[in-house]
Amino acid sequence: MIENQTRTRQLTRAAQPLIHCITNPISIHDCANIILAAGGRPIMAEHPAEVAEITSHAQALALNLGNITDARMESMPKSLKTAGSIHIPVMLDLVGTACSTLRYEFAQKLMNIHMPELLKGNMSELLAMSGQTAHAIGIDAGTQDTLTDANRSHLLEIFQEKAAQWNTTLLITGKEDMVVSADKCTFIMRGTPAMSQITGTGCMLGMICATYLAVTDPFTAAVSAATEFGIAGEKAEKNSSGPGSFQVELFDQFYNLTQQDIF
C-alpha cells in the first residue's frame, strides 16, 4: 500500500488532472490551493448553466455540501449526471448531513442520481447516512460517535455492509480514520489536533481524495490522501507556533512530502 501511495503522488504530478470542484465559499481558496499542492489543476465553477460542460472536461469531480445554497443544489446534480454518463470519478463530502435534514435528503438525492466512487464524512455523518443514530455537534462528529476498540468491529460491519450495498468506498474521518470498501478496510492514525483548529482541513482532505481519484482507484486514493495529509499536519505542527503559521506550514509540508516521509 505504501508503494501505491507514493506512486499515486507521482502519477498525479505527471498527469496534472483537472479537478472540477463545487464547494463552499468558506474553504474554496484553500481547496483550490491544496489541489495545486497535490499536483492537480482546480476549477471551481458552480453556475448551473456551465457546470455540466465544465465537468465534461475534468478528470474528477468533487462535491462538498458545506454551506449549501439553492444555486449549488441546482448545479451539483447536473455535474453528477455528466460525470456518471462519461465515467468521471466523483468524491462527495457529506458535510453536515448528520445535523441538517436538508443536506441529508439532498445527499440521498445525489446518491440516487449516480453513486460517487468515494463518500467522505466524519463518523456522525456516515452513521447518519447509514441509517444509524448519530450525535453530531453542528458539522462536527459528536463525542459519542468515536471509533473505539469496543465498537470497532460493529462499526466496520455497518460500513462494509453499506459500502457493498452502495458499491462505493467510504472514508470515515476522525482521530483515527477508516477507509472501507465491500471487501477491505484500513485504519489510519495520522494527523494532529491542530488540524481541527483551522477551518477547512476536512474540505481540503476531500479535495486531495478527488485529485488522486483521477489517477488511481478510490481505496488507494482515500488511503493516500488521509495518510499524506495527516503526516503533513504532524510535520506542520512541529514547525509552527499557532493556527496562522500552522495553516501556512500545512500547505508547505504537504507539497514537500517525500517518499521517505511516507515510509
Regions found by a protein language model. Give the residues of each.
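Short, well-structured alpha-helical segments that form the helix of a local strand-helix-strand
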Residues: I158-A163, P218-G233, L250-F251
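Short, small-residue-enriched loops and turns at beta-alpha junctions
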Residues: I68-A71, G96-S100, M178, M195
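Glycine/small-residue-rich loop that forms an oxyanion/phosphate-binding "nest" at active or ligand-binding sites
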Residues: R72-G121
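Charged C-terminal helix
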Residues: G230-F263
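Conserved N-terminal subdomain of the carbohydrate kinase-like
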Residues: I2-L92
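Short, small-residue alpha-helix embedded
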Residues: A128, Q197-T227
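Conserved phosphate/ATP/ADP-binding segment of small-molecule kinases
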Residues: R103-C185
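Short pre-catalytic strand/loop immediately N-terminal to key active-site residues, enriched for Gly-Thr
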Residues: I188-T199
